[in-house]
């Protein structure tokens, strides 16, 4: 699973 920056 890739690391995505959603800024939650």
UniProtKB/Swiss-Prot annotation:
Cellular localisation: Secreted
Keyword field: Amidation, Neuropeptide, Secreted
GO biological process: neuropeptide signaling pathway
Entry-annotated residues carrying Leucine amide: 8
Gene Ontology cellular component terms for the protein in this record: extracellular region
Post-translational modification: Position 8 could be leucine amide or isoleucine amide.
Domain of life, per lineage: Eukaryota
Function: May act as a neurotransmitter or neuromodulator.
Family (UniProt): Belongs to the allatostatin family.
Protein name (Swiss-Prot/TrEMBL): Allatostatin-2
């Amino acid at each position: 699973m890739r690391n995505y920056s959603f800024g939650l």
